[in-house]
């Protein structure tokens, strides 16, 4: 296959990329800033806006050249509940704190870290917690649901009518999947459809959508994958030199210790284990580096140019906003003319601490916005004893998808 549309649904921004997978080159790119819609029944994702963006991009790209396929990748911790006709409830924003109201209840039900590799996380960051809260608050709507679909697979279903699940998403801090038992755990209520490989064709574009948007009937739509997990593929396939680290950045910084197929001993903050797109165990570490950076800079807080020992980033449990403090509780004072550089170095230090917590080794392959952040990359290079290799986002994403198809067909 050659000319494929990659739909990349990040938490903050979405991208549509027309790519030639043979040459691994991008041909055209569209971008959109995502919105969370406030109000009833709870903060939720702008599904209609994203649908217009996706279908508009497909129509625009089809006018450039014939398309041979579509693949959707998406951010984690997001699930859509559907019946035959569409959503039975809006798609909950995982930063919404509502599920915390039932935290004690849910904690008695959720599987242990040793079973799922999922640490307990706030708000809706564990999909199991989302489902528990939704089932309690909206029992009638949940009773109507036919499928629970992970975020990329919701769009695959919307484009094709075919319901599938994908392993890298199912095992990503959701409290959903028994790593040893290789099965969905009971807390989910049996709504998830069967697994299919990320590269497989789930179905073809619905005839009504093709006709409405001037697209060819029969356009293949692939199963799709979790965005961070896709970043592993070029560095974990046949002939790869291991161990290595795949670091995907954006709203979240996610780092995978490739070649270290050992469960972390305990759920330290940000530490977890999941399965990669091909079902192999990968310890990983993540924190909201992009959100923390945006929150702290937007708040115009006092930032040191050279963070002192003990200076750290903390998240307000009530608002979810990040701030910079030190462990003594003292106010952090300005320390130079470039406070953002100091913050970037601190974020890099936190990333390195996470890598050590999951016993990572080898070169770091950095993708996403932080790959172009010189201060962040310089701090990684200073603190990590192996090479650090940043790569531009669109180019790396095309390479990831091309590598996925190469591996899947091998």
Where are these regions (language model features)?
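A generic structural motif
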Residues: 32-33, 94-95, 288
